[in-house]
Amino acid sequence: LVGDTFTHLTNGNKGYSVHGKESKYIKWVKDHPLAEGTFYIDNTINDGIGDGRKGLKYLWLLESKHIKPGMVESIIDNKQLVEDTYETIFTHDQRLLALGDKYKWVPAQGFWIKEPKIYEKTKMISMIASNKRMCEGHVKRLGWVERIGDQLDLYGRGFNEIADKEEGLCDYMFSVAIENGEYETYFTEKLLDCFATGTIPVYLGAPDIGDHFNKDGIIDLTEEFEVSEEIYYSKMDAIKENLEKAKEMEVLEDFIYRRYFQ
């Protein structure tokens, strides 16, 4: 694995793409002569082109275009060189997926919840946010905090800090989930963590989210969104379906292995 996107493990090897999770099928190492292939993450595109490593090379784009601007454009501008270097390019970006068979879809993130299930609900609605302002999505999220923060239980860095996301989701029927960007096929743990706790997301993000999950189990975030205990339990079939769909995306390494290597 080339790139510092993932957390380092205490044994000196790399961690995994999803916070607190390990893959069932893939083990990342820094350097190993028997490695079956090398993955290059995000901005390490040029490392793979010029480092002389043997064996198959794969490029994996995890971050959104709002956090890592210019990555997709760089690949499009150097399409032939990238395709000659990499066996497969894994991405959630539709501009790349439209370029051909070398480009394979992977969710932008898995989920962080340790035990995915439908938890007993005792509270109405929460929101997990932070005070970061690195991109448009951060600013938009803070705008919604200002508008509706007094109507829900607010958690996150700079607000009511919590050790684990379960604290802000498990007890709640609904939770506001706002992605860092609003474009097709881009969704992250902000959405999947809701599904993994049986919580209905009040969502602002991928406009095509209904192509991936049961839209009846998602409420669009608007100025007039409505939540109630009656609404929650009327959507239980969709809640169960979205939980099962989310489980398939829990750890991205496992998603990649099952879909593209098995």
Task: List each model region and its residues.
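Pol beta-like nucleotidyltransferase catalytic core
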Residues: 1-61, 65-155, 160-177, 181-262
